[in-house]
Amino acid sequence: MSLSKEVPSFRWTQSLRRELSSYTQQTKTLVLKDAKMIADSLDFNQVSQVQRVLRKAKRSDADLDKLRDLNQEVDKLMVMKSVQKNTILKLGDLGKDELMDLATDLEKLKRKIGDSGRDGPRPYMGNLTQSQLDKRTQILRVLGFQQQTGVSRGVVRLWDVSNPAKLNNQFGSMPALTIACMTVQGGETMNNVVQALTSLGLLYTVKYPNLEDLEKLTQEHDCLQIITRDESAVNISGYNFSLSAAVKAGASLIDGGNMLETIRVTPNNFSSIIKATLTAKRKENMFVDERPGNRNPYENLLYKVCLSGEGWPYIGSRSQINGRSWDNTSVDLNPKPDPGPRAPEKNGQNLRLSNLTEMQEAVIKEAMQKLDPTNTIWMDIEGPPTDPVELAVFQPTSGYYFHCFRKPHDEKGFKNGSRHSHGILLKDLEDAQPGLLSYILGLLPQNIVITTQGADDIRKLLDVHGRKDIKLVDVRLTNEQSRIFEQQVWERYNSLCRAHNGVIVPKKKNKESNIQKEPHCALLDCIMFQSVLDGHLPDTSLKPLLPDNLVHQAKPAFVM
């Protein structure tokens, strides 16, 4: 792709927001909690000293120590932070093409950011010493050349430090810190600051706020006068009142708009976020521009997400993190060992298998031996295939079944599914055994045939877990056919499933169709589908293959 191609920056931002909407959260409450803690507890005399340091043209090791010490104090006061979490993505986490795409873009980012050591354009420095660089600047000035900063009003600040690696992750704004500084140093109430920044955030949902917008909003919100009208300097810190810092704070306060700033990365959703980012990249033909300059929206998201596999990439404190994105996220293109009948491949959505003890694994293996691969085996799930919350595997001839649950990573999507489909409440998943669902799928016999009602989601679920060997048969019942035995099944077997306690609200567009008043339970659905094929309820008694104390974690006892 030609590097001269213009970047439709805000369109890219909107596309990334849409693609990553399921990973955004409502952050206002946490941000304000952190902001109040900082405002009440931080030594703002120390803040003023650091702000003076950052206005200096040249800064020393002692200056950097002041910044790092203050960052540590802020980090201790905050709940919203990113921690050191290095990630190696392998085949199975992402496809080969996706891994290669990611590796290429991280390498380009390394050349763009790492080699330059700054975000903006700058003169080539080669391996010249600082005294040689100063002399070169003097010669150019005598000859009438302008300083080649590439930014008309920006100021290049120089850090003359013995260990440049200590500069990493000490910069970047945090909404909680921005709000606290505007409140305390601006002599404002936090409510006034929040109202003003919220206006900026709402504007940011439709465009990038600029200085003209800021001037107009300042007429309504006087506290915005503290925002600097100058272009940002290189290596701007969270203690500066820049427009970009204010806009980021506003984005974290509006509780809507699918703002990228509100993404939270966890080990369970990391690879899914990367996959969604690469999907948006392909749709909009996004690219990493290796030329010096500010990061475009795709570069910015990729850098921030890959910096740590756990935390808030945009708005959290990240001063705990060592290294850069290309250090902390790496790609291994070697295929994973064949998991055989035991372990699934991960796709970033599955809880870790290490949560199961060896004894628990042995119990599950023994239970799996009781399934007869030559007879019908049903499978059903609740929740999306990339984030399932319930799994049932049921064999009608024997009455044996696996039935387990899993906490979702996308709580917003889960609540929507609970309201309109399965009725599972989040509190009823708190004791779900981590790793169990994935382990069961990994242990299913090789090349087994699974019967389903609607195969698409099950196929995707199995593919995510590296079980492409499993074949599916879709009975393709109509919605009306599949529910013929619904009431009878619930009356007889409701004791088998006690997690579906929410009220089901029909979607408006379905009011004219058959309204399903009962929640969807993966196990009971398998039973009613088989009942439709048989024309009656099961004759055999149903027997769980796993004890309840394995499916659910023991709750801690209350001690006086």
From Swiss-Prot:
Its main location: virion. Homomultimerizes to form the nucleocapsid. Binds to viral genomic RNA. Interacts with glycoprotein G2. Interacts with protein Z; this interaction probably directs the encapsidated genome to budding sites. Interacts with protein L; this interaction does not interfere with Z-L interaction. Interacts with host IKBKE (via Protein kinase domain); the interaction inhibits IKBKE kinase activity. Residues 54-236 are annotated as: Binding site for the cap structure m7GTP. The keyword Hydrolase applies. Keywords: Capsid protein, Helical capsid protein, Host cytoplasm, Host-virus interaction, Hydrolase, Inhibition of host IKBKE by virus, Inhibition of host innate immune response by virus, Inhibition of host RLR pathway by virus, Interferon antiviral system evasion, Manganese, Metal-binding, Ribonucleoprotein, RNA-binding, Viral immunoevasion, Viral nucleoprotein, Virion, Zinc. Zn(2+) binds at residues 390, 497, 500, 521. Belongs to the arenaviridae nucleocapsid protein family. Pfam families: Arena_ncap_C, Arena_nucleocap. It comes from Cupixi mammarenavirus (isolate Rat/Brasil/BeAn 119303/1970). The record marks 457 as: Important for exonuclease activity. It is an enzyme of class 3 (hydrolase). Residues 323-349 are annotated as: Disordered. This is Nucleoprotein. The N-terminal region is important for the cap-binding activity while the C-terminal region contains the 3'-5' exoribonuclease activity. A CCHE zinc binding site is present in the C-terminal region and may thus contribute to the substrate binding and/or the specificity of the exonuclease activity. It is found in: Virion; Host cytoplasm. GO terms for cellular component: helical viral capsid; host cell cytoplasm; ribonucleoprotein complex; viral nucleocapsid. GO terms for molecular function: hydrolase activity; metal ion binding; RNA binding. Residues 323-332 have a biased composition (Polar residues). InterPro entries: Nucleocapsid_arenaviridae, Nucleocapsid_C_arenaviridae, Nucleocapsid_C_sf, Nucleocapsid_N_arenaviridae, RNaseH-like_sf. One of its GO terms (biological process) is symbiont-mediated suppression of host cytoplasmic pattern recognition receptor signaling pathway via inhibition of IKBKE activity.
